[in-house]
Amino acid sequence: PQQEKPQENKKHLNFISREHMLFATPFWQTKVEGVDNEPIKKYCYELRDKTKGVVISNRGGWHSKEILQPIPDELKNFFNQVQGWANNYCAQITGITDLVLGNWWVNINPPGTYNRRHDHQKSILSGVYYVDCEGENIGRLVVERDDNMEFFTTRYQTTSPMCMNNFNMLPYTGFLLMFPAWVYHSVEINRENRDRISIAFNLVDPNQRFEEYGKT
């Protein structure tokens, strides 16, 4: 007898696919134009010479105490621009448009010094601006992810943004980077025969009290 053909399965699965880029970490980088770094550099050295520094993330070098207000004349133009940039940047990712400058400080790293891994708790955005920073061995700025990706020691650990554990940037005079304050970051040893000078800062909710601002 003729064998019965098996019935074809005519059911098809329909997939509606959608890509979700969840938990992305935005960074904003620019080269600052229109800011005279020479008076800022002079201010940084004068501040170092007349005030006692602190040890927080710095290993060697000089780290000023946190500064709230008033902003010195040498930095008013710079911080006015920073606040505008920060709110534009933050508006694109959160809708927040009223961040204000919280605290800021000066870092002077002579040869052989560096800044260890740290974050800036209780702030919303953090940033760093390099006032004087030249040379291939001046020390890279390193930002790190903190979601256990380091446990996946596989061939997938590539330079893909999805797989990398950290990202290194070689700063230069005029380099500005802003990022979410919870991002861990560090700065490598300065191996040049000159100082590395930077100004770091935090931007916060305008209703946040000064004593709540994040520390380095």
Give residue ranges: language-model regions.
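Hydrophobic residues positioned within well-ordered beta-strands of beta-sheet architectures
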Residues: 28, 102-104, 125-127, 197-201
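A short coil-to-beta-strand element that immediately follows conserved catalytic motifs
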Residues: 94-104
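Non-heme Fe(II)/2-oxoglutarate
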Residues: 9-96, 114
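Catalytic core of non-heme Fe(II) oxygenases with the double-stranded beta-helix
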Residues: 106-178, 188, 205, 209-214
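Ligand-binding loop in jelly-roll beta-barrel domains
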Residues: 187-198
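Short loop/turn segments at connectors of secondary-structure elements within structured domains
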Residues: 100, 135-137, 193
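Cationic, low-complexity basic patches in intrinsically disordered or flexible, solvent-exposed regions
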Residues: 3-6
